[in-house]
Regions:
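Alpha-to-beta junction loops
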Residues: 140, 189-191, 290-299
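Aromatic- and charge-enriched surface segment that lines or borders ligand/interaction sites
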Residues: 108-159, 192, 285-288, 335-337
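Short, well-ordered beta-strand elements
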Residues: 57-66, 118-120, 140-143, 191-192, ...
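N-terminal lobe/hinge region of extracytoplasmic solute-binding protein
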Residues: 63-114, 237-241
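Gly/Pro-rich hinge or "lid" segments in bacterial periplasmic/extracellular proteins
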Residues: 166, 178, 188-189, 195-269, ...
Length: 375
């Protein structure tokens, strides 16, 4: 992923480590290690622009890429949806945007058993939903039950299969109580999660929106427990527990979120609003960026990378990004049912040429799904 970004002196929203600048948490998609160039352009326009007005207005203008299909954390399946959802909903843990190490989120602390199977999370007593309701451990259990409900058909339900007996409920047709899924609310502020196996990266996994809570009364009001496409995610209906509230959503135009006064750490949220602009064309995004309409873009066209490297080498910055591009073949149909054909395609794929001449973003040729040192 390639980004264009202008530096401003505001944080986007809550960052636990107050010494860190504004940033969106880095995203984890797949398992392979990539390098991401981030371009910082300093400079202004002759007339006041969105970027120049940002210091006074305290509004971040964010190029979103594609229009999110869902803003429901249990149905979303895209980076663009992720960028909006993390402004609206907070999970049990957060992360340091520089080290990616887990930090307290809705849970102010947690305990891990010696065998690594039992995690006990202590929910903040001052954590609230945007309508003022308290955030409780029961909300998380309800949310896990919802995303694992096979009738909801969530694409990311398998992210929760690490919970003990989660598969029995999700795939084998057992009822929640009968399956005895390893998610129990001991009381309003104590949540216990039991795993099938020790999972060293479990806390990092909780940063994925599939683990985020949904407001149970709102889900029930709109009959959304096992239905897709209900209106609970529209402005005025959306109840989240994150630093921002959904204010406006014009499809393929703008998604605006405004500061949530009920957020438990609202005092550290410097921005008053974020405006996300779904702009699928990387060239259009770049023009919007250069005109001062956007603070940052979602991507950069590969055919622009060489120019930017040659003409602005001092402002291109590469950052690590986790993601994997791969080819998938139908192994049951000719010719790919023949292992020799698959091997030939594998040997004929010049990964180095692809990253140097096609993607051009400093990506690393992938020989497997997991990069060295991660698995």
């Amino acid at each position: 992923m390639l980004l264009l970004a202008k530096c401003i002196s505001l944080r986007t929203f809550h960052v636990i480590n107050h010494s860190l600048p504004w940033t969106f948490p880095k995203r984890v998609i797949g398992h392979s290690f990539w390098l991401v160039p981030m371009l910082f352009l300093l400079g202004g326009c002759t007339a006041p622009s969105n970027v120049e007005n940002a210091i006074e207005d305290k509004i971040l203008h964010f190029g979103l890429g594609s229009e999110p299909q869902y803003l429901d954390p249990h149905l979303a399946s895209s980076v663009s949806a992720h960028n909006v959802i993390i402004a609206l909903i907070e999970g049990l843990v957060s992360e340091d945007p520089k080290t990616l190490k887990p930090l307290p989120g809705v849970a102010e602390s947690w305990d891990i058993s010696e065998d690594g199977l039992l995690y006990t999370f202590h929910i903040r007593k001052n954590a609230k939903w945007s309508n003022g309701d308290p955030v409780t451990a029961h909300d998380f259990v309800y949310s896990y039950r919802r995303i694992l409900n096979p009738n909801l058909a969530s694409q990311y339900a398998s992210m929760l299969h690490g919970l003990k007996n989660a598969r029995k409920y999700h795939e084998e047709g057992l009822k929640w109580e009968e399956a005895k899924v390893g998610a129990v609310a001991i009381d309003n502020h104590t949540l216990q999660l039991t795993l099938e196996n020790p999972t060293p990266y479990f806390l990092e996994l909780l940063n994925h929106y599939s683990w985020f809570p949904a407001h149970p009364p709102t889900i029930k009001k709109f009959d959304a427990f096992e239905k897709q496409g209900t209106p609970w995610t529209r402005p005025g209906n959306y109840v989240g527990n994150g630093p921002f509230i959904l204010y406006e959503h014009k499809v393929n135009s703008v998604i605006e979120v405004k500061k949530n006064p009920n957020y438990w750490d609202a005092e550290t949220v410097s921005l008053e609003a974020i405006r996300f602009y779904p702009i699928e064309s990387a060239d259009t995004e770049e023009r919007a960026f250069r005109s001062g309409f956007l603070h940052l873009t979602q991507t950069v066209s590969p055919d622009r990378i060489d120019f930017l490297k040659q003409n602005h080498p001092e402002i291109i910055h590469f950052e690590p990004y986790l993601g994997t591009y791969f080819y998938r073949f139908n192994l049951e149909e000719p010719p790919f049912d023949d292992v020799r054909v698959r091997l030939a395609f594998n040997l004929a794929t010049d990964r180095q040429a692809i990253v140097e001449k096609v993607t051009k973003g400093g990506q690393v040729p992938a020989r497997c799904f997991t990069p060295p040192g991660t698995g």
